[in-house]
Amino acid sequence: MGVQKSEVETTSSVSAEKLFKGLCLDIDTLLPQVLPGAIKSSETLEGDGGVGTVKLVHLGDASPFKTMKQKVDAIDKATFTYSYSIIDGDILLGFIESINNHFTAVPNADGGCTVKSTIIFNTKGDAVVPEENIKFANDQNLTIFKAVEAYLIAN
């Protein structure tokens, strides 16, 4: 299995607690409001929203993909850390075993936060994820971040 990793860091004027809640805990209800074309629906297949929960996400018309199955790997409300894995769906392109996503919001002295996002692509065999796919994943995460951030600032 091959492993490729991408890390992105950005800052926000929104507090770490509020951003963590919006981007991680409330994302299933918030995302359809702020980016209507991103997802059509999300259904819980197993669990209660905590660690181990498995969700089937039906992506919206703005996405080139149709579905993805996500599993919540870790939630730490004290450190504003959330991790989940994409374990199934056409988003895996047939040569990716899974995609691990890690999000941390670190409080800043000014009341805002620094957001650290890590994506780990676990490929089948010796497959390599093309750079344009990695860039697409980072761009999608940034688009979601900016939309949620704008909503939280306005509300």
From Swiss-Prot:
InterPro entries (alphabetical): Bet_v_I/MLP (IPR000916), Bet_v_I_allergen (IPR024949), Plant_def-hormone_signal (IPR050279), START-like_dom_sf (IPR023393)
UniProt keyword list: Pathogenesis-related protein, Plant defense
UniProt superkingdom: Eukaryota
Gene3D superfamilies cross-referenced by the UniProt entry: 3.30.530.20
Example GO BP: defense response
PROSITE patterns in UniProt: PATHOGENESIS_BETVI (PS00451)
GO molecular function ontology, one term from the record: signaling receptor activity
GO cellular component: cytoplasm; nucleus
UniProt-listed PANTHER family: OS08G0374000 PROTEIN-RELATED, STRESS-INDUCED PROTEIN SAM22
Recorded family membership: Belongs to the BetVI family.
Record protein name field: Pathogenesis-related protein A
